[in-house]
A protein has these predicted regions:
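A short, glycine/Asx- and small/polar-enriched loop/turn
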Residues: 122-128
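Core beta-strand elements of the Rossmann-like FAD/NAD(P) dinucleotide-binding domain
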Residues: 133-142
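Conserved N-terminal/central alpha/beta ligand/cofactor-binding core
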Residues: 15-119, 134, 146-166, 170-175, ...
């Protein structure tokens, strides 16, 4: 199994396949950013907490890593009915990232390789491998694509735009083109990150502490 990408989805896919006995190759454009929490250091939350719990129930690593690196745990939406309650944990970003990388590195059936996948290798409507931007080919019976925001990634800062998967990293434009050539239709979703506040510009004495929950 080849897994393209090493974010939340890529890690869970790689570990699940490896723990089921498959030989897994995880390909990441930068092996030092495996499990990186790019913007919000939260696991769970509204419309996401149930998914994090389902992953945990199926033996995933996300919940365990959150327990080990969490800073604050809360149940959101408790003013409403139990059907819309949502668990959320705020994590130590670097501790979460480093622990996830450590977990992946020690998994027996999982090999980690650095490289940007630029092309799907396929014939007769069947994928049989990938090719990197350096021209290296890897072959497998199954290819799982977990590229997150990197496919044709476009970043907006104010009125300015630039191509990129996230700050400081290039977009995966080659793989996007390869998917289109294979007959797959690509769409675009957009997410926004609010401006951060300068701590010394805030009068902290006027704020109310919001503690976590047991």
């Amino acid at each position: 199994v080849i897994v393209v990408g090493a974010g939340h989805a890529g890690i869970e896919a790689s570990l699940a396949a490896a723990r089921m006995g498959c030989e897994v190759l995880m390909l990441s454009t930068n092996v030092d950013t495996i499990g990186q929490m790019s913007c919000n250091p939260a696991i769970g939350g509204l419309a996401k907490g149930h998914l994090a719990r389902e992953i945990d129930a199926l033996g995933g690593e996300m919940g365990k890593c959150t327990d080990m690196t969490g800073l604050q745990f809360r149940m959101l939406n408790k003013r409403k009915g139990p059907a819309v309650w949502a668990p959320r944990a705020q994590c130590d970003k670097k501790a979460y990232q480093f622990r996830m990388k450590w977990i992946c590195e020690r998994e027996p059936n999982l090999t980690i390789q650095q490289g940007q996948v630029s092309k799907l290798l396929h014939a007769e409507r069947k994928v049989h491998g990938v090719e990197t931007a350096m021209g290296v080919e890897y072959f497998a019976k199954t290819v799982v694509i977990t590229t997150g925001t990197f496919l044709r990634g476009l970043m907006h800062v104010g009125d300015a735009q630039q191509k990129g998967g996230r700050s400081g990293e290039a977009a995966a434009t080659g793989l996007s083109g390869s998917l289109q050539e294979a007959g797959l239709e690509l769409g675009r979703l957009k997410t926004g990150t609010p401006p951060r506040l300068l701590k010394r510009s805030i009068d902290l004495s006027q704020l109310e502490e919001q503690p976590g929950e047991d």
